[in-house]
Amino acid sequence: LAVKSAVKSAVSFTADFTGEVQRFIGISLSGGKADKACVAVVEHYPKFKKIFLSKIFEKIKTEAELSADLKIHDFIQGYEGKVESVAFDVPWIRPFCNRCDLPCPGYESCQVEHIQWMRKHNQLEQKKKKPKKLFTPYTERSVEMYLKTEIEEPMNFGPALGANLAPLLARASFIQRRLDLPCIEVFPKLSIWRIGRALDISKTHLRYHRHSTSGNESRRVILQALTSNNLAFVYEQDFRLMVENNHAFEAFICALTGYLRYTGQTEARPAGFPSNEDWIEFPKEKLRFPT
């Protein structure tokens, strides 16, 4: 009932709407030859103090001579000049070490800012571990090392150029470089955790929203909390789609994180964090939504 009530409100609300709108796009990528990529568009109406999921473009695949990458680009480009941010769920820039053009002494003795930070951070963490491991700055970034150790919930942050993320980074880079829009990086699992805890959702649901057997129910609970609290308006068919399709759900979460960043509700870089390194946008622990 709460879902249907929120859906009815969304239909009535958008039918009557006139005025300013702020848009945020979220992208959940899959492998370039797969058909799982999704794009979501979230709209914020300051006059009405409402957030609305206006569109989901799902299961984007290559057809004949038309690539899925071009479909994604054209869809986003249609909003050029009307979007505050485009949020990718993967990195699109190679680790800084991999792009450095300075004479290389080896990362064991390199004095570049981010290498010094990574070395110090790694040394502090390795004091607690056996066997000790050295970091690899050509595959991983400072932000991944930071988030692995400094947030309240342990999460697996794979290296940007690790086996799992490297193909997605290449695809995101290809798409992003053609866009003339502000782009940010989001780690959906962390955004879901922070948003869910702010809504007092069970930790089990937040930890297993991707699970093959219980993920659908976890996504339903999370979406129910957002809609029943009037924090986001979602059409019923989109609600069902996001319950059934995790890529669609995470694209929505990426776009929603873009809204939180726009309203100053994502975490800033910590003091001393390398100035030339990438950053992942993720929500603060305490959030305020439009009411």
What are these regions (language model features)?
Residues 19-25, 29-291:
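RNase H-like (RuvC/DEDD) metal-dependent nuclease/polynucleotide-processing core
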Residues 1-18:
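Intrinsically disordered, low-complexity segments enriched in serine/proline and basic residues
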